[in-house]
Each structure stands twice: as C-alpha cells, then as structure tokens.
C-alpha cells in the first residue's frame, strides 16, 4: 500500500538511507541532506525540520515546509517537500511541492501516485485555488507526472515550466 508519512524519529534509519540516496541536485530537486551523517540527521535535521514545519526558527523569507516520505508498504520510494504557504519567490518559482523518487524506484508510477496523495493532503490547507509547481524543461518525465495529475503549463522561462493544478 502506498502512503505518505512525515519525517519522524521512529523511521529515522530508513529515512536516512532514503534521503542520502537522493543526489544533491538532480532534475531541479535539491537535497541539502544528501551527505549528512546519521547522527547529524537524527540530532539536527529531524528536530530542525519538525520546528520549521511549524514555522519555528525560520530563516528570513522562508515559509514552513514539511518533508513527507512516500512509502510502498515498508520501503521508502520517494520524498516530497511540501509548502502550504507561499511567499512571492515561491509563487513565481518552485511553488508548493518539490519531489524526488529514489532512482531504483523510477518509471513505476510512484511520482504520479505520490503527487496525487500530496494534492489530496494539502488541497484544503492552502490559500490559493491552485497548486503551484515548477519543473526543469530538461525533465519531461516530471512534467508528464504533473500533467497526469491535472496540471497545465501556466508560464515558462528559459529553463523551467511553471504548472498549476486546479483544486
């Protein structure tokens, strides 16, 4: 069964293995935790992410962000970064959701099914009547994922498509 679970201490070992298997920056998905030690993950990253998800100790111009791992039964297959509030930078850029699927689980529909779960999770909690997402133009698979979830291309620049999903 496929489900989302927020970053937590109970699953720290599996979360650590998953998050460190995702590259630092691949296809526009930035993973600032790719090279941390397990101790740093448990003692620093998880507590910091918990606080920041509640809006505590945010850096200037930052919004609360939640990390949801996508699980298929007892295996983590991906990671979704979710922002329920947007600032101007996010509204014009990355948007509400960023996601990455662990390489060995790609091309199995996990991104589409995970994105649908995230949309369902946040649709009643965001201020906008659309979900904002961006995608690198050189990542057609991610664009296809978004289109499969009802997205349309709202805007574009040289490097990115900016999509919207009506809710």
Q: Model-flagged regions — what are they?
A:
Residues 1-96, 158-167:
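GNAT-family acyltransferases
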Residues 3, 98, 132-134:
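Short aromatic/hydrophobic contact patches that present stacked aromatics
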Residues 83-84, 96-107, 136:
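A short, internal acetyl-CoA/4′-phosphopantetheine-binding micro-motif in the GNAT/acyltransferase core
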Residues 98-101, 107-121, 143-148:
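Conserved acetyl-CoA-binding loop-helix of GNAT-fold acetyltransferases
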Residues 124-134:
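Conserved GNAT acetyl-CoA-binding A-motif
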Residues 136-137, 160:
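Conserved beta-strand edge residues that scaffold enzyme active sites
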Residues 137-155:
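Conserved active-site alpha-helix within GNAT-family acetyltransferase domains
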């Amino acid at each position: 069964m496929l489900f989302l679970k927020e970053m937590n201490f109970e699953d720290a070992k599996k979360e650590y293995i998953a998050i460190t298997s995702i590259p630092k920056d691949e296809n526009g998905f930035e993973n600032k935790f790719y090279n941390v030690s397990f101790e740093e993950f448990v003692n620093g990253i998880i507590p910091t992410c918990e606080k920041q998800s509640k809006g505590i100790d945010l850096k200037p111009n930052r919004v609360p962000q939640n990390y949801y791992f996508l699980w298929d039964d007892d295996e983590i297959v991906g990671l979704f970064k979710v922002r329920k509030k947007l600032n101007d930078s996010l509204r014009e850029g990355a948007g509400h959701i960023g996601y990455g699927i662990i390489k060995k689980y790609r091309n199995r529909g996990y991104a589409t099914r995970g994105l649908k779960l995230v949309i369902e999770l946040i649709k009643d909690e965001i201020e906008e009547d659309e979900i904002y997402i961006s995608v690198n133009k050189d990542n057609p698979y991610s664009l296809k994922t978004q289109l499969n979830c009802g997205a349309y291309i709202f805007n574009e620049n040289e490097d990115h498509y900016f999509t919207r999903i009506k809710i």
